[in-house]
């Protein structure tokens, strides 16, 4: 009788509603059925873990409920985007190997061993009838890494050059840079806040989700005293590998710095936040990539001329002169496409069982295949 290709030894683990511990078995399958149980084990839960699990189990409109419902809503919006892609590309769903979906980061605490990107990839797979690959960051964190940034490996694939050092700067909610050395080595790390604080301030004082074309910031003046107060943040002095997020750089962080500057015009604060983004990026380039021949910007901030102008000036002020700042359009990839392309690439790597992280970037102990597969 032919052997089932899925036959072999499997472990099964189950911790039930009693929350007393986890039961496990090691079982060999033959012809798709358990042929022999090789071992069993039980590991009890400590009282502290049981108490934590019972507390999390309480029903109601709590954080767990809100996260789950938000994840469902996100998956629905992701499905709309996928349908648009199918329509616009005229590619049948059956030809799509996989959807690589990052999810929405709501917590990033690698120092505590976790990062959380909410999403419901099972629901997305059910709606699209296409394999979905998600949860890219957690394996890197499990291997001792920061789980971020992940895009430098992709940047190296598409933007690297043998004869010069290049910097790719992503200006999303958080800024990060990838250093593509002429030698072929790659470094990358988060620099600090970008659109996260700029958008927060624009929403508060303009009633708009972002500062379109940087007009709000252009109407203000950089306040050097406030800028220095903002720069007095320990994260900016940390050595890479490092990553950050809205856990640190959020409205509360900004508001805690502002009381001595209550007389400042709102536009001046916005201009100073632009300067903060530019200076923190420029300082890292000066420290780690002073031989760069060009800086290529992607992400939402690439469409803000005030940030690009400020970054060019900050580089000059940092002693990195004559290095042009331009968008990734110059390399043939529109700034808005870089990150979704990166997660399509990571999905492809997962399908091929190839590593997607760079330990030199994230600090992980070794290369790892990233992502969890949710079959169609």
Curated annotation (Swiss-Prot):
Q: In which pathway does it act?
A: Amino-sugar metabolism; 1,6-anhydro-N-acetylmuramate degradation; Cell wall biogenesis; peptidoglycan recycling
Highest taxon of source? Bacteria
Q: One short Pfam family name for this protein?
A: AnmK
Q: Which InterPro entries does the annotation name? A: Anhydro_N_Ac-Mur_kinase (IPR005338), ATPase_NBD (IPR043129)
How would you classify this enzyme at the top EC level? Answer: transferase
Task: Please tell me where ATP binds in this chain.
Answer: 16-23
Q: What is its EC number?
A: 2.7.1.170
Give the UniProt keywords, A-Z. ATP-binding, Carbohydrate metabolism, Kinase, Nucleotide-binding, Transferase
| Protein's UniProt keywords contain Nucleotide-binding | yes
Provide the catalytic activity annotation.
1,6-anhydro-N-acetyl-beta-muramate + ATP + H2O = N-acetyl-D-muramate 6-phosphate + ADP + H(+)
Show the GO MF annotations: ATP binding; kinase activity; phosphotransferase activity, alcohol group as acceptor
CDD domains linked? ASKHA_NBD_ANMK (cd24050)
This chain's function reads: Catalyzes the specific phosphorylation of 1,6-anhydro-N-acetylmuramic acid (anhMurNAc) with the simultaneous cleavage of the 1,6-anhydro ring, generating MurNAc-6-P. Is required for the utilization of anhMurNAc either imported from the medium or derived from its own cell wall murein, and thus plays a role in cell wall recycling.
The record's listing under NCBIfam families reads:
PRK09585.1-3, PRK09585.1-4
Family, similarity comment: Belongs to the anhydro-N-acetylmuramic acid kinase family.
Q: List the HAMAP family hit by this protein, alphabetically.
A: AnhMurNAc_kinase (MF_01270)
Listed name of the protein: Anhydro-N-acetylmuramic acid kinase
Q: What is the lineage of its organism?
A: Bacteria, Pseudomonadati, Pseudomonadota, Betaproteobacteria, Burkholderiales
Q: Its gene? A: anmK
